[in-house]
Regions:
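Mono-ADP-ribosyltransferase
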Residues: 1-256
Length: 256
């Protein structure tokens, strides 16, 4: 608290009175501690271990929506000690379910803004951190599966009109090692008549296995989606398509 009092004295009374919650206090201390370490590095023992965040990482850490993901840094460091914890936290936040306090950190919002080209500070830093993490995570080569419901018009424009062509996506692409997870996504009731159920069978070359740090890893939640994530901008050959007996479209993609 003494160091913190020197760095940002205005917060001390709020901490002592319990107005600032512990998790917020911890992140705030880290935020100011980085500058303190940088400005006073000659006084810091060489064996003193501390995470000093860069500008991009600071922007991510100080967002309230990342608190849950950042609270798991000890776990990340045990699983992948060579990957910066903030990068792993960005992947975890991306995979979290939408909630009242976490609408803008999830895959749906991030991908929506990436695909629409809508500027947003959080999406910019989070997507950069996710891409950095993916470059360090285990590569998966083999077949993976993705389930999606989409309008006939969108299906036609994005895939059916491009058999034999190479296509790409401005957003990240989630998939699973097993068929059961995507089948759950497309088997939900209430799909409009104008939409079709689609299963993508993807031959992965550079997809990254995020199953250990995903929100749905069998530890943070009981469900394990065995997720393989493709970086934004990944290119795929639309090899072929077929229609199953129940009307589900199956699109075969080959990562380029």
């Amino acid at each position: 608290l003494k160091i913190f009092e020197t760095a940002c004295p205005a917060f001390v009374p709020l901490i002592e009175e319990g107005i600032i919650e512990n998790d917020i206090m911890d992140l705030t201390i880290q935020y100011y501690m980085d500058d303190f370490i940088r400005d006073n590095d000659k006084y810091i023992r060489e064996d003193f271990k501390v995470n000093v965040y860069n500008k991009t990482e600071k922007t991510f850490v100080r967002k309230r929506r990342t608190n849950l993901a950042m609270s798991r840094v000890e776990y990340y460091n045990k699983i992948y000690p060579h990957i910066p914890e903030v990068q792993q936290a960005a992947v975890n936040a991306y995979t979290q379910a939408i909630s009242s306090g976490n609408k803008g950190a999830t895959s749906r919002e991030i991908n929506r803004r990436l695909r629409n080209g809508t500027e947003d500070e959080y999406v910019d830093v989070a997507s950069r951190l996710i891409s950095q993490a993916l470059s360090r995570l285990p590569k998966y080569e083999g077949v993976v599966y993705r389930g999606e419901t989409m309008s006939i018009k969108k299906l036609q424009e994005r895939f059916l009109d491009h058999i034999g062509d190479v296509v790409s996506d401005k957003g990240f692409i989630s998939s699973s090692l097993y068929m059961d997870t995507p089948m759950k996504f497309i088997s939900r009731a209430g799909i409009p008549k104008s939409h079709k159920r689609v299963i993508f069978e993807i031959q992965s070359k550079n997809g990254r296995n995020i199953s250990n740090i995903s929100e749905f890893n069998g530890i943070f939640t009981l469900e394990n989606q065995h997720e393989i994530l493709f970086d934004k901008g990944t290119k795929f050959l639309v090899k072929k398509r077929r229609i199953e007996g129940d009307g589900t479209y199956r699109i075969i993609l080959v990562e380029q």
